[in-house]
């Protein structure tokens, strides 16, 4: 991924996060990260979703923290390089939303 990640400023957050909040992403209390839970019809759809996200995350060299049980996938995004939320997280969350919508 080109360029060093920087932690989002208050102004950048005000500009970039409302669309993600509107679709269920939440900022984590006590940690500079965003989180969302996804529910699918079954395990195969949940795993397919994770596979599509994983391929994109690898291309971006920006990987989510996630947890899966059967049809549920919990995702947390934060950028280790800047110890907080960066535009990389916003971009990956937006991609994740597109994948989730296409799989429901």
Swiss-Prot record:
Name of this protein: Pterin-4-alpha-carbinolamine dehydratase
Protein's job: Involved in tetrahydrobiopterin biosynthesis. Seems to both prevent the formation of 7-pterins and accelerate the formation of quinonoid-BH2. Coactivator for HNF1A-dependent transcription. Regulates the dimerization of homeodomain protein HNF1A and enhances its transcriptional activity. Also acts as a coactivator for HNF1B-dependent transcription.
Main location, first listed in the record: cytoplasm
UniProt keyword annotations, A-Z: Acetylation, Activator, Cytoplasm, Lyase, Nucleus, Tetrahydrobiopterin biosynthesis, Transcription, Transcription regulation
GO biological process terms held by the UniProt record: tetrahydrobiopterin biosynthetic process
Ligand binding (substrate): 61-63, 78-81
GO molecular function: 4-alpha-hydroxytetrahydrobiopterin dehydratase activity; identical protein binding; phenylalanine 4-monooxygenase activity
N-acetylalanine PTM sites in chain numbering: 2
GO cellular component: cytosol; nucleoplasm
Enzyme category, top tier: lyase
Enzyme nomenclature, EC number: 4.2.1.96
Quaternary state and interactors: Homotetramer and homodimer. Heterotetramer with HNF1A; formed by a dimer of dimers. Interacts with HNF1B (via HNF-p1 domain); the interaction increases HNF1B transactivation activity.
Membership in a protein family: Belongs to the pterin-4-alpha-carbinolamine dehydratase family.
InterPro entries: PCD_sf (IPR036428), Pterin_deHydtase (IPR001533)
Catalyzed reactions per annotation: (4aS,6R)-4a-hydroxy-L-erythro-5,6,7,8-tetrahydrobiopterin = (6R)-L-erythro-6,7-dihydrobiopterin + H2O
Annotated Pfam families: Pterin_4a
Location of this chain's protein in the cell: Cytoplasm; Nucleus
